[in-house]
UniProtKB/Swiss-Prot annotation:
Function: Serine protease. Hydrolyzes the alpha chains of fibrin and fibrinogen completely, has lower activity on the beta and gamma chains of fibrin and fibrinogen.
Highest taxon, organism lineage: Eukaryota
Species, as recorded: Alitta virens
One biological process term in Gene Ontology: proteolysis
CC terms in the record's Gene Ontology section: extracellular region
Protein family membership: Belongs to the peptidase S8 family.
pH dependence: Optimum pH is 7.8. Active from pH 4.0 to pH 9.0.
Key words, A-Z: Fibrinogenolytic toxin, Fibrinolytic toxin, Hemostasis impairing toxin, Hydrolase, Protease, Secreted, Serine protease, Toxin
Enzyme Commission identifier(s): 3.4.21.-
Full protein name: N-V protease
Catalytic temperature dependence: Optimum temperature is 45 degrees Celsius. Active from 30 to 55 degrees Celsius.
Tissue-specific expression: Body cavity.
Predominant place of localization: secreted
């Protein structure tokens, strides 16, 4: 399960997803470390395996990324 992060303890970075999406509107976001992503109020755990953290987003989805501060942010956004 995902850790229960508190937004008051970490830097919150707002990323506006406004990219070219494929015809199936599949946007894969995965992370090399232990992070959490807030999508429209829903916290999603990001695993090293891209398929484990795959989500379907709209092009106007606002993504909030919580950085634990332990390591430098290392996020990958793959479009398929």
């Amino acid at each position: 399960q995902a850790p229960n992060y508190s937004t008051a303890s970490y830097n919150v970075v707002a990323v506006k997803i406004n990219l070219f999406l494929s015809t199936n509107n599949k946007l894969y976001i995965h992370d090399t470390g232990v992070r959490a992503v807030y999508l429209a109020g829903m916290k999603v755990y990001l695993a090293a395996n891209p398929t484990a953290s795959s989500q379907t987003f709209n092009s106007d989805t606002l993504v909030y990324i919580l950085d634990t501060g332990i390591n430098e942010p290392n996020y990958y956004i793959n479009l398929y």
